[in-house]
């Protein structure tokens, strides 16, 4: 999420806190939890720097560009406001000297915490901006304070990760996997649906590993036992979504064997149309030698077989993935294997990063580092092939009538998304204005749209 605080406005006497949220959806959920707690304690949220008594900056520290963006945002907040508390992944990052990076670059910050640290952030806020005496807890909705539009929300089911991928430093910043109690997750989901959310995006560092840390302990929801495991959680969320006519979308699904159990829920039975036929699976590469150096599962042939089997069971399945091109030691032949994989798997939506060393990642010690121009050329070539595959798949939708969730309405019509499109990262559907009053649509509504055109990313249609 971009920094949305701007300079202007008048100073306000009430205790107000500004919030800058950077990074991934997991960080966004952390920001929402902080804002919810602030509101619960009677603080108000300011949309400007100079309208705030204090600013909290939630940072990202995954890649060098994100680190710099976070450091710049902290600097801007210090310049515009002066009282800044920093939280998030960058807070856990050390500098070359071994001290905290943020404190070294920006020594004037009031406090620094790591990610998923609502309690520590609130302690820092209390120290520098004492809370009001009479908090109005009833002013905070049961669903909490959200930074997303009212009709969709992220549901974080766990924190941390047990994997040790050589290119990643997330575990060193967010720690080992910690799964939320299943009843707590279900209660949050229910409150979100009750508040009008029509699409719930399930996120974590590793959604498929949900419950591993508690040995799939059995919890209880609505008086019945419910195992703390991805399969059972998705089934329960799908049942809940069906009651509200809503969608559940799965992100960060590591391809464990039990993911196969989810596909039939998407394809048939009462959960069809509610557990969306959509999987965000971070494959990262397809050649076994590269995957081995990445410390990722290395059976690409088996993965391709599974993808093809998933599509047999659920022909409408959309698969999104992310890849790294130019990883240390990647040969021309290994890169071609990667291109063959995305063609054969017919991946619908893909993103690709040119490999970039991340401070603290074990991949930095690998031999065979490739020049910047080679890495970037491979990324560009990868995206050319990926767009060809995507364009071919998306063209098949022309002439079909699809269910679309409207995100925006303007003078030119509407902008929405199908079951195949997650917000912000996938394509959209441009919907023509309704010709009749009976067909007019609003933000947050589902409408049936006949698809009339497509490119490699987006669709066009009419109600």
From Swiss-Prot:
Pfam family, one: Radical_SAM
Superkingdom of the organism of origin: Bacteria
Cofactor binding comment, as recorded: Binds 2 [4Fe-4S] clusters. One cluster is coordinated with 3 cysteines and an exchangeable S-adenosyl-L-methionine.
Binding site for [4Fe-4S] cluster 1: 24, 60, 89
Binding locations of [4Fe-4S] cluster 2: 161, 165, 168
Chain ranges of the TRAM domain: 395-463
Cofactor names: [4Fe-4S] cluster
Catalytic reactions of this protein: L-aspartate(89)-[ribosomal protein uS12]-hydrogen + (sulfur carrier)-SH + AH2 + 2 S-adenosyl-L-methionine = 3-methylsulfanyl-L-aspartate(89)-[ribosomal protein uS12]-hydrogen + (sulfur carrier)-H + 5'-deoxyadenosine + L-methionine + A + S-adenosyl-L-homocysteine + 2 H(+)
Enzyme Commission identifier(s): 2.8.4.4
Family that this chain belongs to: Belongs to the methylthiotransferase family. RimO subfamily.
Protein name according to UniProt: Ribosomal protein uS12 methylthiotransferase RimO
Species in which this protein is naturally found: Burkholderia pseudomallei (strain 668)
Organismal lineage: Bacteria, Pseudomonadati, Pseudomonadota, Betaproteobacteria, Burkholderiales
Gene for this chain: rimO
């Amino acid at each position: 999420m971009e920094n949305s605080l701007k300079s202007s406005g008048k100073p306000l006497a009430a205790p107000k806190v500004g919030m800058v949220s950077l990074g991934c959806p997991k960080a966004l959920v952390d920001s929402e939890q902080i804002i919810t707690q602030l509101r619960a304690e009677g603080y108000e949220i300011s949309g400007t720097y100079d309208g705030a008594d204090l600013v909290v900056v939630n940072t990202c520290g995954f890649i060098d560009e994100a680190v710099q963006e976070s450091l710049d945002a902290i600097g801007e907040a210090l310049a515009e406001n002066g009282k800044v508390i920093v939280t998030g992944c960058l807070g856990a990052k050390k500098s070359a000297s071994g001290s905290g990076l943020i404190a070294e670059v920006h020594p004037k910050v009031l406090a620094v915490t790591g990610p998923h640290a609502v309690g520590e952030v609130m302690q820092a806020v209390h120290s520098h901006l004492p809370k009001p005496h009479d908090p109005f807890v009833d002013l905070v909705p049961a669903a909490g304070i959200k930074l997303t539009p009212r009709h969709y929300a992220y549901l974080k089911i766990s924190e941390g990760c047990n994997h040790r991928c050589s290119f990643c430093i997330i575990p060193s910043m967010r720690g080992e996997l910690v799964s939320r109690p299943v009843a707590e997750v279900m209660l949050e989901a229910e409150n979100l649906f009750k508040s009008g959310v029509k699409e719930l995006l399930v996120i974590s560092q590793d959604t498929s590993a949900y419950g591993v840390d508690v040995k799939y302990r059995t919890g209880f929801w609505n008086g019945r036992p419910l195992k703390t495991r991805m399969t059972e959680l998705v089934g329960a969320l799908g049942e809940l979504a069906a009651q509200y006519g809503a969608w559940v979308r799965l992100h960060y699904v590591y391809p464990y064997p039990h993911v196969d159990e989810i596909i039939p829920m998407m394809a048939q039975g009462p959960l069809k149309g509610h557990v969306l036929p959509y999987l965000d699976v971070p494959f990262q590469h397809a050649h076994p030698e590269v995957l081995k150096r990445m410390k990722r599962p290395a059976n690409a042939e088996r993965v391709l077989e599974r993808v093809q089997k998933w599509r047999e069971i659920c022909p409408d399945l959309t698969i999104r993935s992310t890849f790294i091109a130019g990883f240390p030691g990647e040969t021309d032949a290994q890169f071609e294997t990667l291109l063959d994989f995305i063609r054969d798997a017919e991946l619908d939506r893909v993103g690709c990063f040119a490999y970039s060393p991340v401070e603290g990642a074990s991949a930095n010690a690998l031999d065979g580092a490739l020049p910047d121009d080679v890495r970037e050329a491979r990324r560009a070539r990868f995206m050319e092939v990926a767009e060809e595959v995507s364009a071919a798949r998306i063209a098949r939708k022309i002439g079909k009538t699809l269910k679309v969730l409207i995100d925006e309405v303007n003078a030119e019509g509407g902008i929405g998304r199908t079951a195949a499109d997650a917000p912000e990262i996938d394509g959209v559907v441009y919907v023509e204005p309704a010709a009749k009053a009976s067909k007019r649509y609003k933000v947050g509504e589902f409408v049936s749209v006949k698809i009339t055109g497509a490119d490699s990313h987006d669709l066009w249609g009419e109600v």
